[in-house]
Regions:
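A solvent-exposed, acidic/Ser-Thr-rich amphipathic alpha-helical stretch
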Residues: 29-81
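Short hydrophobic/aromatic-rich beta-strand segments that constitute the beta-sheet cores
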Residues: 43-44, 87, 113-114
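Short beta-strand segments that buttress and anchor functional surface loops
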Residues: 86-94
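Short acidic-aromatic low-complexity motifs
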Residues: 2-39
Length: 119
């Protein structure tokens, strides 16, 4: 039976982004790191460099504790290739409204490198 509704195709990069945001909102750092980051993955920001599952889990726990909540106001830019994701979003936390920038280098659907910034 024909319908006027179009199926929305979710790309691997969009799925990764959606899961990343969901786990951050749910404070699910274990699942976030275990499912989205390689064992030796590295996160690079201007404030620090963090490498490995244990350090990443500690980093995200502390990060979420400081922010308390994350509300995505808009996904301003998003681009992906078969092994990269790069996005800009406007978010609100208890610290205020900011623009965040995140780039991921992926291997087998998991991050090997995560570059992040806030403005």
């Amino acid at each position: 039976m024909p319908t006027n509704e179009r199926e929305t195709v979710v790309t691997p990069g969009q799925r990764f982004y959606n899961e990343q945001i969901a786990w951050l909102r749910q404070d699910s750092t274990e699942e976030l790191i275990d499912r989205h980051y390689h064992q030796d993955a590295i996160l690079v920001s201007f404030a620090k460099v963090v490498q490995g599952h244990a350090a990443l889990k500690e980093h995200f726990r502390a990060y979420l504790e400081i922010l308390e909540k994350i509300e995505i106001l808009s996904l301003d830019q998003f681009v992906e290739t078969k092994d990269t994701i790069f996005f800009e979003a406007t978010v609100r936390t208890v610290k205020g409204q900011v623009n965040v920038y995140d780039a991921f280098v992926l291997r087998d659907g998991k991050a090997t490198h995560h570059f992040t910034g806030v403005k």
